[in-house]
Amino acid sequence: DFAVGAVDSCNGRLGAAGLENVRFRCADARDTGMRAASFDLVVAADLFEHLYPDDSRKVAREAFRVLRPGGTCAVWTPCPSHILEVLRNRDIILKRDISHVDYKSMPRMQDILTAAGFEIARAHYAESHLRGLNLAERLLQRWVPLLRRRIAVVAVKPGDP
């Protein structure tokens, strides 16, 4: 994470969660300074919408670099076509999040990852946590882009673990 306070808070909760092999670090996701091929998993949850196009490519390349062969990069990002994002970006009912500088579509997110060297293992739209709306999303998102809440992509670095 980029926020020291968030990293400190997460690290403070690891003991209670019984997670001894997990550490949160404050770093620039474009150039972490971590050793190459040193991680099994990279999670980019609600990150890519905050990155400009060139930074998105750099972050994907850095994730690829730090993952071991066979390692996984999991991406979770808002879908720009969802009704809540459409309303928010027009300041209708919801306030626009100015930190969301570049929403990615599903094909574009996959292109960013494959250009970095990843193979896409799974890509789907995930429904929201809002009751009622999530049922409609689950049933209809295939045909109604306004109901595609989240883009979820699991990408793998080729090679044997």
Segments from the language model and where they lie:
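S-adenosyl-L-methionine-dependent methyltransferase catalytic module, highlighting the catalytic core
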Residues: 2-9, 13, 17, 30, ...
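Short conserved loop adjoining the S-adenosyl-L-methionine
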Residues: 31-36
